[in-house]
Amino acid sequence: HIATFKTTMSAARYVPNVYCYEQIPIPRLYLNSFCPDYYVNITDTIEKKLNSSKAHISQIKKYKSIGLNIIENLEILSKFRGVQAKCKYAEAFKIIKKVW
């Protein structure tokens, strides 16, 4: 992931705004080090997001086999970020580079 990030940042050197998206927490060695500073209200599109995520059947099966429901986790995370953003559901991002 570090190499991908570095490559992306190099490729985006002339792009004015770069944001990192939050991944769904999967308890392996998960340390919550993600500190968002930008939120997008997704209240109107949460159902579409959840339904689209259900297309990732292999990931759903993989984590279901160890007792995790990643669709449920995604909804919970979106609700949590919604509380932070003062709306019902939100996505969180970390601003890496922004031209104001």
Language-model segments: what does each one mean?
Residues 1-100:
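Metal-dependent de-N-acetylase/amidase catalytic core
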